[in-house]
Amino acid sequence: MQLDNILSQLFENQALTKAESQYFFEQVIQGNVSNEQLAGALIALKVRGETIEEIAGAVEAAFANATTFPTPDYDFADIVGTGGDGQNTINISTASAIVAATLGYKVAKHGSRSVSSKTGASDVLSALGINVAISPQTARQALDENNLCFLFAPLYHAGFKHAVPVRQTLKTRTLFNILGPLVNPAHAKRQLLGVYSPEVLKIYAETVRTLNHQHSIVVYGSGLDEVAVHGETLVAEIEDDKIHYFSLIPEDFGVQRHSIEALRGGEPTENAEKITVLLQGKGEAAHIDAVAVNTAMLMRTFGERNLKANVQRVKDLLRTDKAYQTLQKLAQYQ
């Protein structure tokens, strides 16, 4: 296979096979593609729209070159968004992961520093005093003992660093936004995946189905890569090799509506302060409800289908400081 041929295909608007995509992204990960070539390829893919085969090939390339994580044989999940929704909200997925772990659900959260928003998952966790760069063995220990670990993407997918200058220069969503949530190094087979557009929802669901997940849910929440409390959430639920599409509104979870402005965050320190207050049992109503609906959806991937009951469990918890204790325990893993 020749890199030049693959680039020519992309520039002539031809889709790549899974094998061609895997080859191309392995070349990227190994540092064999120039910034100019990569920028051109990512834009060509974005403008045409990435296919399931192209995304799946990139996923295979990432896993083939990743640092291994000792995957446990018990059930665990991930909750992660593509980012790139441009809304700069507080880190709802990160807070939800901490809450779910406190309720007894094991979560291996995959994430990185922000490239296309103000504050990524690892930015806010660092501000909360968490060492995001712990070894795979220490992270596994945290998952075993504390129901929660954070897997810092650059540690596991070191080759992605070759794409960072291009991503930062382009300042737009690319296949790497799509890729991140799908390449959890622990190989999570239960995931709540947030996407940045309704168009990506279907292609994401189809891609997840090819990756043999047990029970995963893809959501797009009226402009957010999360379950929304300000409007409708489009849902694709992947279970037993079938995809079920439906939509939900805040009332389906038993919560009231809040404006998206009520969820706005900012720099990592600001987001960390808001999340700390929330986990200590003193959160704002909008923050509580946003975390409750997202945690409720994550619980569903473990078979807890009653969303209103799930929300109630979260709200009861967020009247205490138990979730903050989980965060403090996580900070002890160095």
Swiss-Prot record:
**EC number assigned by the record:** 2.4.2.18
The terms under GO molecular function for this entry are: anthranilate phosphoribosyltransferase activity; magnesium ion binding
Q: Which InterPro entries match?
A: Anthranilate_Pribosyl_Tfrase, Glycosyl_Trfase_fam3, Glycosyl_Trfase_fam3_N_dom, Glycosyl_Trfase_fam3_N_dom_sf, Nuc_phospho_transferase
Cofactor binding annotation: Binds 2 magnesium ions per monomer.
Protease in keyword set: no
Entry keywords, A to Z: Amino-acid biosynthesis, Aromatic amino acid biosynthesis, Glycosyltransferase, Magnesium, Metal-binding, Transferase, Tryptophan biosynthesis
List the Pfam families hit by this protein, alphabetically. Answer: Glycos_trans_3N, Glycos_transf_3
Q: Which GO terms describe its biological process?
A: L-tryptophan biosynthetic process
**Name this polypeptide is given:** Anthranilate phosphoribosyltransferase
Q: Per the UniProt entry, what species is this protein from, by scientific name?
A: Actinobacillus pleuropneumoniae serotype 5b (strain L20)
What gene is this protein translated from?
trpD
